[in-house]
Amino acid sequence: MSHKSDLIATNIQKYLQQRQQKELLRFITCGSVDDGKSTLMGRLLHDSKLIFEDQLASIVADSKKVGTQGDRLDLALLVDGLQSEREQGITIDVAYRYFSTDKRKFIIADTPGHEQYTRNMATGASNCDLAIILIDARKGLQTQTRRHSFICSLLGIKHVIVAVNKMDTVGYSQQIYKSIQDEYLKLAGSLQIPDIRFVPISALDGDNVVSKSPKMPWFRGSPLMHYLETIKIDYAYTDEFRFPVQLVCRPNSEFRGFQGTIVSGSAKIGDTIRVMPSGKITTIKSILSFDGELNEAEAGQSITITTYDEIDISRGDMIVHKDAISHVSSMLRANIVWMSEQPLIEYKDYYIKFLTKQVIGSVNKFNYKTDINTLKEVACGTLELNEIATIELKLSEPVCFDSYQKNRTTGAFIIIDRLTNVTAGAGMVIKPLAANDKKDSTNDYSEFELELNALIRKHFPHWDAKNLRE
C-alpha cells in the first residue's frame, strides 16, 4: 500500500503516534441516486493513495465485468461491496471507509440515494459532523437532495459542502453551476445549516477533488479535500456532564459502582452530582476505569463511579452535576424519521429507547409532517415509510433527556416495534411538554437532610421547622 508518509517505512511507531494524535472528522456523502457518491469516495481513497495493490488489481478486473465506465476504472466499486450493489450499480447499505491525510483522520459514510433506502441514510448521518451533498450538474436538485438536506438539518449537522458533480458532462459550465448554487441557497433558507460551501467537481476525472482543476478557472474557491482538512468543527455541543447508567456493578457486599460511558462533559472525584429522574444528590467517591483509578474523566470514557451515599441508582438513570439538570418528563415533542413499512399511527404502543432507558410510549398527537419538495407543514394522521413529522409522544413513565439541539446524544431516541423488535423510527427531542418537567423542590436536599427534617418535625414540633418536602 502506498502512502504519502515516508514514516511507514522508516519509523512505524512514530507514524502510528502521529496518526493517533490527528483530529478525527466523520462525514457523510449523500444526494440523489446516481449523483456519484460512491465514485467520489473511491476518488478520495484513490488520490489519497490509501488503496492496497491487490485492491486496485481487483477493481481493475471488476471494472471490466460489472463496471459502468466502459474501459475506464470504476472507482465506485471500491465502496459498493455488496454483490447486489455491484450488479445494480447502486448503493444499498451504508458503507463506512477510513482514510487519513497529513492533517486529519476521516471516517466516511457513503449512503444510498434511492428513496426506499432513506432510513439507511438517516442512520449514517446520525453520528456525522459534516455532510457532502452531491448534485448531478445535468439534473440539478432532486427530491432526494431536498430530503437528505432536511434530514441533515434535523440531525444537527452544522457543516455542509454542496459538491456539484459531473461538471465534465456539461462542459464545465459556470452558468449551470451558478444556477444550482442559487437554487440550493433558496432551499437552505428553510433549513438550520449555518455553514454551507460549494465546489464544482468531477469525481470520475478528479477535478477539484484533491487538487484544483485547471478546467474551471472561473472557480475561485478551494478543492474539496482542502475544505475537509481545514473546516473547523465544534465538537462540544454541551459541556454539561451526562452519564447514563448502563449497569450497577456489585461484585461483593463491599463494593457498589455504577458503570457507563460519559456522553458529554466531565466529572472528577469530589463533584456533587444529582441522579435523574429521582433528583437525589450525592458526591463522587471514586472513578474507576480499565486503566485503574482516575481523578477525572471526560466524554467518551467508559468508567465506574462510586458514591459516598447509599442512594437508589439503577440502569437507565442519568447522573448529572447538581446544578446542570436535564429535563424529566413523560410527554415530549419530537421530530420523527419513520423507517418502517408499517405506518406510525396514534395511540399504538411502541418501545421507546433513550440510551440505556427503555419505556413504552405512543403518539399522542401528530402536529404535522413535512412536505419534502416544499418544506411546508402538512396535516397528517399517520406516518409512512421515509416520511418526516413532528409529533407529541406520551411515555409510560418520566424519563430524563435534553433537547436534541443541545445534546445530540441525550436528545435522541429510537422507536422499536414491540412485536418484531425492529427499529421503526428515529426521534430527535424538541422540548418536554408535561408539567413534571418542573424542578422538584426536594432536589436541593440530600436524602439524609430530608429524613432528618422529618424526624425534627415529628419529635420537636415546637421548633416550627419547615417541611422540606413541600
From Swiss-Prot:
It is an enzyme of class 2 (transferase). It comes from Francisella tularensis subsp. tularensis (strain WY96-3418). This is Sulfate adenylyltransferase subunit 1. Keywords: ATP-binding, GTP-binding, Nucleotide-binding, Nucleotidyltransferase, Transferase. Belongs to the TRAFAC class translation factor GTPase superfamily. Classic translation factor GTPase family. CysN/NodQ subfamily. Residues 31-38 are annotated as: G1. GO terms for biological process: hydrogen sulfide biosynthetic process; sulfate assimilation. HAMAP family: Sulf_adenylyltr_sub1. Residues 22-238 form the tr-type G domain. GTP binds at residues 31-38, 110-114, 165-168.
